[in-house]
Amino acid sequence: QKKDKKDRFY
């Protein structure tokens, strides 16, 4: 689970 710069979860 990675967190993007815009608070998006993958």
UniProtKB/Swiss-Prot annotation:
Tissue localization of expression: Expressed by the venom gland.
Domain of life according to the entry: Eukaryota
Protein's cellular compartments: Secreted
UniProt keyword list: Pyrrolidone carboxylic acid, Secreted
Main location: secreted
Pyrrolidone carboxylic acid: modified positions: Q1
Gene Ontology CC entries for this record: extracellular region
Family, similarity comment: Belongs to the tachykinin family.
Stated name of the protein: Tachykinin-like peptide-VIII
Protein's organism: Phoneutria nigriventer (Brazilian armed spider)
